Amino acid sequence: MSLICSISNEVPEHPCVSPVSNHVYERRLIEKYIAENGTDPINNQPLSEEQLIDIKVAHPIRPKPPSATSIPAILKALQDEWDAVMLHSFTLRQQLQTTRQELSHALYQHDAACRVIARLTKEVTAAREALATLKPQAGLIVPQAVPSSQPSVVGAGEPMDLGELVGMTPEIIQKLQDKATVLTTERKKRGKTVPEELVKPEELSKYRQVASHVGLHSASIPGILALDLCPSDTNKILTGGADKNVVVFDKSSEQILATLKGHTKKVTSVVFHPSQELVFSASPDATIRIWSVPNASCVQVVRAHESAVTGLSLHATGDYLLSSSDDQYWAFSDIQTGRVLTKVTDETSGCSLTCAQFHPDGLIFGTGTMDSQIKIWDLKERTNVANFPGHSGPITSIAFSENGYYLATAADDSSVKLWDLRKLKNFKTLQLDNNFEVKSLIFDQSGTYLALGGTDVQIYICKQWTEILHFTEHSGLTTGVAFGHHAKFIASTGMDRSLKFYSL
């Protein structure tokens, strides 16, 4: 039978057992340990020498103990030193085991702390977004206190009650009529002449991609869904993204001027104000936001709808917004006060609106519906004055030409239809490739060119209605396209998160 000492891991000369832990020890080692600690080395229970129980085993014949000479004395000293080393080694093993357990516990605590920090960070971010949403309500502007001639919004307005409509007052109607008269007169003066600075078709046909920017919106939620250029300075680009942000970008300096945060869902429509440093955005979160670009802050939240806002257009006066929604209503709102002036639906249709666009004169506008209809409305009378059937599938985009005569429309039927507003009929249909998607339509400022964006970007020359340019640079669906001043460049955005520019 072989016994092993629990301290030295060697066969003991004088084995004994501890009744506390039932472990076997070399008597001299355990006695030294008890003398120092008074406990059992295995379970740290109190233990005395009297409690130790000797174990009787058959020992091999051993030589007589050394006599008191110098060599035996050295051996005895070495034996004592070895005993001390064994005791120290055993203590270190115990401490190592304890340290490992403490380290494991600390690692679990660290992991739990990281999870808590991540959750709290997410909650703080959500709280900040909620605060940004509530801030526009802080400084309520009483509508009567804001003169109609005031050039810009200087405070934050109250999100209005959906049931509280101000109405189209005679003063507002007269203002709209006066502006339309001025614009019509200017258009007649211009006649059919094309600006000399406008890029010629043969030059436009040579356009190629000259720049691409992918850092405007989040990479984790890719996609730019809306695009607009500032009418007074087309170097200023406005985009709305799937990341819920609105971004103002300067083409000339290639710098982001402002990142506007506040929407709780993706941004699907954006509009630049032509003369004030304001931009507008709409989202499926059922809100329209008015932003100050210099302050990078929201100055008004217009709550005109109960469902997703699908279209946004600024009136020629620069004082009113037109919006369309999944709630089947179009709304006409005052940007000075953030209040809804009127809100109308076509009760005979009962269908969601997909887009909305003002005519250049501002007295009529068009809306697209989910059931393939294009409806023309009289703003002063709030009545549906004409319908343009012919598409199949939801209407995806509509665009009025600056000449005031043409309307371009697109739907999920791989076609673009051109309508003559004087004769109220379809005079041309651009039939595209099968499964070609059209998400954006726009005429240039002179009404000479028509651009469409979707599966790719195509440019047509009006009157002949022939394609003169075709871009396939976007790796995803093209969601927006726009012309620079006098068509000196073309801009496009897409689901590949890029803003691209094309020119000579």
Swiss-Prot record:
GO terms for molecular function: identical protein binding; ubiquitin protein ligase activity; ubiquitin-protein transferase activity; ubiquitin-ubiquitin ligase activity. The keyword Cytoplasm applies. Keywords: Acetylation, Cytoplasm, Cytoskeleton, DNA damage, DNA repair, Lipid droplet, mRNA processing, mRNA splicing, Nucleus, Repeat, Spliceosome, Transferase, Ubl conjugation pathway, WD repeat. Residues 68-223 are annotated as: May mediate interaction with PSMC5. InterPro entries: G-protein_beta_WD-40_rep, Pre-mRNA_splic_Prp19_cc, Prp19, RING-Ubox_PRP19, Ubox_domain, WD40/YVTN_repeat-like_dom_sf, WD40_repeat_CS, WD40_repeat_dom_sf. It is found in: Nucleus; Nucleus, Nucleoplasm; Cytoplasm, Cytoskeleton, Spindle; Cytoplasm. The modification N6-acetyllysine is found at K122, K179, K244, K261. WD repeats lie at residues 219-259, 262-301, 304-345, 348-387, 390-429, 433-472, 473-503. It catalyses: S-ubiquitinyl-[E2 ubiquitin-conjugating enzyme]-L-cysteine + [acceptor protein]-L-lysine = [E2 ubiquitin-conjugating enzyme]-L-cysteine + N(6)-ubiquitinyl-[acceptor protein]-L-lysine. It comes from the Eukaryota. It holds the Pfam family WD40_Prp19. Pathway: Protein modification; protein ubiquitination. One of its GO terms (cellular component) is U2-type catalytic step 2 spliceosome. PANTHER family: PRE-MRNA-PROCESSING FACTOR 19. The 7 WD repeats are necessary and sufficient to support interaction with the RPA complex. Ubiquitin-protein ligase which is a core component of several complexes mainly involved pre-mRNA splicing and DNA repair. Required for pre-mRNA splicing as component of the spliceosome. Core component of the PRP19C/Prp19 complex/NTC/Nineteen complex which is part of the spliceosome and participates in its assembly, its remodeling and is required for its activity. During assembly of the spliceosome, mediates 'Lys-63'-linked polyubiquitination of the U4 spliceosomal protein PRPF3. This is Pre-mRNA-processing factor 19. It comes from Bos taurus.
